[in-house]
Design a protein with these regions (language model features):
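Early extracytoplasmic/lumenal segment of secretory-pathway proteins
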Residues: 10-73
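Extracytoplasmic ligand-binding site segments that recognize negatively charged/polar headgroups
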Residues: 16, 20-22, 58-191
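Short beta-strand-to-loop elements that line the ligand-binding cleft
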Residues: 37-43, 64-65, 173-179, 215-217
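A ligand-binding cleft/hinge motif common to bilobed small-molecule-binding domains
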Residues: 69-73, 193-212, 255
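Periplasmic-binding protein-like
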Residues: 93, 106, 166-170, 176-177, ...
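A bilobed periplasmic-binding-protein/Venus flytrap-type ligand-binding module shared by bacterial periplasmic
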Residues: 109-116, 155, 225-237, 256
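Extracellular/periplasmic bilobal clamshell ligand-binding domains
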Residues: 273-305
Length: 305
């Protein structure tokens, strides 16, 4: 739009949650550079839908997603501008590629309401116990790339037993909710007792605000969800976009990421929560999108019954 172009020094960032982190990074960058940042924050699904809808007149300069997959998809489509940040040295190799890099990392766990009157779960399969009958929610893998990753990770580590587990959870009354927040809210409010595969940082924030929740990472393993940042090739402000990514990866920017209860992408920035070395991380590499589609279809069919 003409309005946006009239301000030569405006940068538009489309980002998944948390909104408070996006605002904090935008204001920190603005203070440092004088570049005004416009933020559009929504779920990854909504952010991606908006990008698709704006193809004829692209608005976003920088995209921060909650799903590594979206970055790989846009890379394949040739939408991304290659960029190596000077601050990328401290970011592990598996969290960066030629045209996207992690802002931070979350992991999926069991989020349990400690006042629910249920025994504290330690393992995924504990949620199939009679104590958890009709008391478990899970985010919808059709709406959450990380939830689909968890299904794939468990299938990779457990083989056919993973599907036995999903079947037993279904028989025990597990409900497939919408995105992460919709799965966590009933557990926080006490209507349900536990979430199978919730995003950790959101619940750490809730705990800090006094909620009676606990985040549990099963020893058998879980999956991580690195949050990729990328610059769109259509950006009219590639210089400012690169400077923004440099800022997010600076010690100051990464401290803000840590304040949001995420794991920083940089190894040399302290976190307020367990880091990767405390987790058993399951591999989620699958044979591309067809495999993802097959796992999603099988799960959706199981839970539609």
């Amino acid at each position: 739009s003409a309005m946006m172009l009239s301000s030569a020094h405006a940068l538009t960032v489309y980002t998944a949650g948390p909104g408070s982190l996006a605002k904090s990074l935008a204001s920190g960058f603005e203070q440092q550079t004088g570049v005004k940042v416009t933020v559009f924050q929504a779920t990854t699904g909504k952010v991606m839908a908006r990008l698709e809808a704006e193809q004829a007149n692209p608005q976003a300069d920088v995209l921060i997603s909650a799903s590594w997959d979206t970055a790989e998809d846009l890379h394949q489509r040739g939408w991304l501008l290659p960029f190596a940040s000077a601050n990328a040295d401290q970011v592990p190799a598996n969290l960066k590629s030629a045209d996207y890099i992690a802002q931070g990392v979350s992991a999926l766990g069991i989020v349990w309401n400690s006042k629910s009157g249920t025994p504290e779960p330690k393992e995924w399969r504990d949620l199939t116990q009679p104590a958890f009958k009709d008391k478990v929610t899970t985010p919808d893998p059709a709406l959450s790339g990380a939830s689909l990753d968890l299904l794939i990770g468990l299938q990779n580590s457990m083989g056919g037993q993973a599907w036995q587990l999903f079947d037993e959870l279904k028989k025990n009354g597990m409900v497939v909710s919408g995105p992460n927040a919709q799965a966590v809210t009933p557990v926080m409010q006490g209507a349900k007792a536990a979430v199978f595969g919730a995003v950790d940082y959101v619940s750490y924030g809730n705990i800090q605000q006094g909620e009676s929740l606990k985040v549990i990472f099963p020893a058998s393993g879980t999956v991580i969800a690195p949050r990729p940042m990328m610059i769109l090739k259509t950006s009219q402000h590639p210089g400012e976009a690169k400077a923004f990514i440099d800022y997010v990866l600076s010690p100051e920017g990464q401290a803000k990421v840590a304040d949001a209860w995420l794991m920083p992408a940089r190894r040399d920035v302290a976190a307020k929560r367990p880091l990767l070395d405390a987790l058993k991380v399951l591999p989620t590499t699958s044979e591309g999108s067809s495999e993802r589609g097959a796992v999603l279809a099988r799960f959706s069919q199981l839970y539609a019954q």
